[in-house]
Amino acid sequence: MGHAARGKVGVLLLNLGTPDAPTASAVRRYLAEFLSDPRVVEIPKLLWMLILYGIVLRVRPAKSAALYQKVWTEAGSPLMDISLRQTAKLSDKLTADGHQVSVHLAMRYGNPSVASTLREMHKQGIDKLVVLPLYPQYAAPTTGSAFDAIAKELSQWRYLPSLHFINTYHDNPDFIAALVNSIRDDFDKHGKPQKLVLSYHGMPERNLHLGDPYYCFCMKTTRLVAEQLGLSKDEFAITFQSRFGKAKWLQPYTDATMAALPSQGVRDVAIVCPAFSADCLETLEEIVGENGHIFTHAGGEKFRYIPALNDNDDHIAMMANLVKPYL
């Protein structure tokens, strides 16, 4: 394609990824790619490869596949289904607002890959690229890894597009407002719980000490949401879920908190996951299934999950407002 034929603007939405199917073989392929990323597991490569291929990928795929089967729908992976709807709705929103832009979706691991999606955008003549990783709070293993994948592909291009990479939106007013509105809607429908738990994806505590701002960004998101909801310190809690391995991760842990709350007199809990832009295994199974059971088994009476922002109108409007300054 000639240079004169270029001049198109592209928006790339990027999320973590999902197996192609809820089977052990598909999950194994996905986990092998995910857990081979040095941004995700920061231990000496040779040692980790021995552990990964000698132990983890022998045991974990079948167990994870069974969990994926619980949340899989006729539309497939919940994360993929929601992400495709987000992409289509953002495209419609930007078009309605007068922007000529092509919106694409890529997954950091699995399909559609970052490389294949960028190549498709390149074929379309896109020479202005706006990347929005759908991780509200920057973290090196997520947002940082997304940038790595984009840079790896672009390093092979002769003609580079202008690039705008949105690295965090943890305190963006539209994001906070969308979260607050979703929580208020839940409170209006089901009543205000004794405690609102804001559960974020965890990470090794070591990452914090190495300078990763994720923990601080999670704290700020929580503070802004609690302030706008008018919650006292006793009415909300911040926790971290999905820990993996034996290292110390960010605390307090979500599962330990769910087990302890009933003994503290908290019998009615609502939980929201502000680090997840779309519902997925970690919310639909780990939170709704595992942690809901932990809470009720410990004596809790009412447990409910407030869905991720997914493709609701406030969320799509927020995405549009994030990318518009760069179009």
From Swiss-Prot:
EC number: 4.98.1.1
Gene Ontology molecular function, alphabetical: ferrochelatase activity; metal ion binding
Superkingdom classification of source: Bacteria
InterPro entries in the record: Ferrochelatase, Ferrochelatase_AS, Ferrochelatase_C, Ferrochelatase_N
Cellular compartment(s): Cytoplasm
Residue positions binding Fe cation: H201, E282
Main location class: cytoplasm
One GO cellular component term noted in the UniProt record for this chain: cytoplasm
CDD domains, per database record: Ferrochelatase_C, Ferrochelatase_N
Similarity-based family: Belongs to the ferrochelatase family.
Function summary: Catalyzes the ferrous insertion into protoporphyrin IX.
The protein's name in its UniProt record: Ferrochelatase 2
Organism, as annotated: Shewanella oneidensis (strain ATCC 700550 / JCM 31522 / CIP 106686 / LMG 19005 / NCIMB 14063 / MR-1)
Top-level taxonomy: Bacteria, Pseudomonadati, Pseudomonadota, Gammaproteobacteria, Alteromonadales
